[in-house]
Amino acid sequence: AAAAPGAAGGAQLPLGNRERKAGCKNFFWKTFSSC
């Protein structure tokens, strides 16, 4: 589990895998324009 940055880190970090597309319009709009 600790060796899975895409699964564990993606769920905890705001810039993870699921948050990247889910919160893309939440906080990514101010950082990344080409979401």
UniProtKB/Swiss-Prot annotation:
Somatostatin inhibits the release of somatotropin. It comes from the Eukaryota. It is found in: Secreted. The gene is sst. The lineage of its organism: Eukaryota, Metazoa, Chordata, Craniata, Vertebrata. GO terms for cellular component: extracellular region. It comes from Lampetra fluviatilis (European river lamprey). Disulfide bonds join 24-35. Belongs to the somatostatin family. Keywords: Cleavage on pair of basic residues, Disulfide bond, Hormone, Secreted. GO terms for molecular function: hormone activity. The keyword Secreted applies. This is Somatostatin. Signal peptide: none annotated. Pfam families: Somatostatin.
